C-alpha cells in the first residue's frame, strides 16, 4: 500500500507509565506503529508528568495530561474536548481498568464529537470485575479459583481456614501478593487498602505455570485471534516485565 492511500488517523492512548507496575500504553502504541496500513499521529494521555512513555523516542507525537479518574466524568470530558479542539482526535484507546467506567459514561458525548471508541457496556465491565470473577466463571463455564471479598482485616483468619495457605491477597484494581502466613496476609491487606482502598480480594492459590491469553472475539462466540503469553520476569508488583508468546 502506497503512502498516498494510507488512512490518516489521530489516535489518543492512555497508560504511558512504564515502571514496575507498567501501563499497556507504550506496548499498544508500538503495536499501532507496526501496522503498515495507517498513517498515524499518536497523542499520549498521561496522568503524571513523569510517566516514562512521555519521553521515549518514537512513542507519542504529542502528550497531554488528563485528570485522574477520581475527578469524575465532567472533568475528563472537558479536558478531552479541549485536546480534541487542537488535535482532531479520531480514536481514543483507554488502557487502565480504573479509567474505563468514566470513558464508557462519556462514550456517547465522544461519539458526538467525532471520536470513536471500542468499549464494553458498563454492565459488561462490571461482570468481569475481579470481585465478580468467580461468579462470571461459574456462569460461563470457566474454572476460576475461589475468592472472598473482605472489608475487615479480621476476616483474614476465617478465610485462611477455608482456603489454607498460601493465599493471594489482591487489590480491587491492581497488584497482588502471595501470602504464606497470617502476618504476611495482614501486611498485604494494609498495603493494598492504603493504595487502592476497600474491598480486598482474597483468592485461593493455584500452583503451576501461569499462561495469559489475549483474545479477540466477534461477540457471538467465535474467536478471531488469540495470543498466549508466558511471563518470564515479574516485578515486585506482580506485573509482567518480560515474556514470550507461545
Name each region found by the language model.
Residues 183, 203-246:
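ATP-dependent carboxylate/phosphate-activation module, predominantly the ATP-grasp catalytic core
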Residues 46-51, 97-99, 123, 219-223, ...:
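Short glycine-enriched loops at secondary-structure junctions
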Residues 80, 103-106, 156, 189, ...:
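Aromatic/hydrophobic pocket-lining residues that form π-stacking "cages" and hydrophobic walls in ligand
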Residues 44, 93-94, 119, 146, ...:
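General beta-strand structural signal in soluble alpha/beta enzymes
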Amino acid at each position: 500500500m502506497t503512502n498516498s492511500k494510507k488512512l490518516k488517523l489521530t489516535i489518543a492512548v492512555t497508560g504511558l507509565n512504564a515502571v514496575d507496575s507498567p501501563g499497556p500504553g507504550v506496548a499498544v502504541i508500538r503495536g499501532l506503529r507496526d501496522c503498515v496500513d495507517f498513517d498515524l499521529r499518536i497523542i499520549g494521555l498521561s496522568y503524571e508528568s513523569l510517566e516514562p512513555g512521555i519521553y521515549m523516542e518514537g512513542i507519542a507525537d504529542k502528550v497531554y495530561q488528563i485528570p485522574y479518574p477520581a475527578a469524575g466524568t465532567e472533568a475528563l470530558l472537558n479536558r478531552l474536548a479541549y485536546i480534541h479542539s487542537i488535535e482532531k482526535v479520531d480514536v481514543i484507546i483507554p488502557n487502565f481498568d480504573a479509567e474505563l467506567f468514566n470513558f464508557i459514561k462519556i462514550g456517547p458525548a465522544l461519539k458526538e464529537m467525532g471520536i470513536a471508541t471500542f468499549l464494553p457496556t458498563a454492565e459488561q465491565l462490571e461482570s468481569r470485575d475481579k470481585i465478580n470473577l468467580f461468579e462470571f466463571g461459574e456462569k460461563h463455564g470457566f474454572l476460576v479459583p475461589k475468592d472472598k471479598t473482605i472489608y475487615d482485616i479480621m476476616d483474614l483468619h476465617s478465610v485462611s481456614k477455608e482456603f489454607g495457605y498460601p493465599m493471594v491477597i489482591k487489590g480491587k484494581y491492581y497488584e497482588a501478593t502471595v501470602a504464606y502466613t497470617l502476618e504476611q496476609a495482614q501486611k498485604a491487606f494494609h498495603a493494598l487498602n492504603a493504595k487502592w482502598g476497600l474491598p480486598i480480594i482474597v483468592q485461593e492459590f493455584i500452583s503451576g505455570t501461569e499462561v495469559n491469553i489475549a483474545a479477540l472475539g466477534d461477540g457471538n462466540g467465535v474467536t478471531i485471534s488469540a495470543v498466549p503469553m508466558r511471563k518470564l520476569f515479574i516485578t515486585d508488583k506482580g506485573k509482567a516485565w518480560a515474556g514470550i508468546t507461545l
